[in-house]
């Protein structure tokens, strides 16, 4: 019984103090993913017309 109470208090304290720092790290990670997605989308917009032109010439 006593162990459960100590575990619960420790869990609540960890959630209270560590929750804010994790949010910043997660946001920073998502910004990197968003930037990579934007680069892929831009490259696709530049490359797809070229690929369609080559397919039109070959096929």
Swiss-Prot record:
The modification Valine amide is found at residue 58. This is Cecropin-C. Pfam families: Cecropin (PF00272). Cecropins have lytic and antibacterial activity against several Gram-positive and Gram-negative bacteria. Belongs to the cecropin family. One of its GO terms (biological process) is innate immune response. It is found in: Secreted.
């Amino acid at each position: 019984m006593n162990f459960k109470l100590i575990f619960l208090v420790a869990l609540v304290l960890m959630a209270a103090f560590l929750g804010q720092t994790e949010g910043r790290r997660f946001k920073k990670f998502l910004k990197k993913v968003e930037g990579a997605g934007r680069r892929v989308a831009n490259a696709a917009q530049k490359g797809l017309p070229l690929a369609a032109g080559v397919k039109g010439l070959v096929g």
